[in-house]
Amino acid sequence: MCNPTVIVAHPGRQHSFRVAKALKEGGLLFRYVTTVYNKDDSLLMRFVKLFLNKDSFQRASKRKCPGLDDNDVIQFCELEGILLLALQRIDFTRILSNKVQRYVTNKFQRKLANYVIRNPQIEAVISYDTNSSVLFSILKDKVPHVKLIMDNAHPNRHYLYHSYHENWGCVGDFSKTL
């Protein structure tokens, strides 16, 4: 890849900031795509911050990556993302917020898929675990040349257990400290 053609996408935040920042430092980031991001020129975020308490204001202010310029960030479903964050703070049963999260995540993935389809210079998309299924199924059919990379913050324990035991002998004396 000689031009920056990788998209990092997550409708929340997770550790996607770090991946996007590292790709930008390596000259590979095309765009970081998310829902809620504290852009300097975001009127919606400014308005929302007017009504937040101190703790929530600080949390909202952290939705920005110091290593990324605002031009590096694209937002889809910003209003829905903000409403979801508010709902998650008050819906302790998670019944309604889980349904809204599924809706926002699926809508985000469809919008992102359309964006990738319209930008043929994109060579790879990095997405995260449960936020990938709709996106990947659309892209697999419409733009099969795009590499689809799923980052999973919570790897399968069963797989890790077997992998650990298969490779136990390869690490020598270090294995005794585990």
Predicted segments, located by residue:
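Short, well-ordered alpha-helical microsegments
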Residues: 15-18, 132-136
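N-terminal low-complexity, Ser/Thr- and acidic-residue-enriched intrinsically disordered segments
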Residues: 5-51
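A conserved catalytic-core segment of Leloir-type glycosyltransferases
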Residues: 2, 37-107
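Short, polar loop motifs at secondary-structure junctions
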Residues: 36-38, 130-133
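Aromatic-acidic/polar surface patches that form glycan- and anion
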Residues: 9-13, 101-105, 128
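Short N-terminal targeting/anchoring amphipathic segment
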Residues: 6-10, 74-75, 113-132, 139-141, ...
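Acceptor-binding helix/loop patch of EC 2.4 sugar-transfer enzymes
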Residues: 48-49, 77-100, 146-178
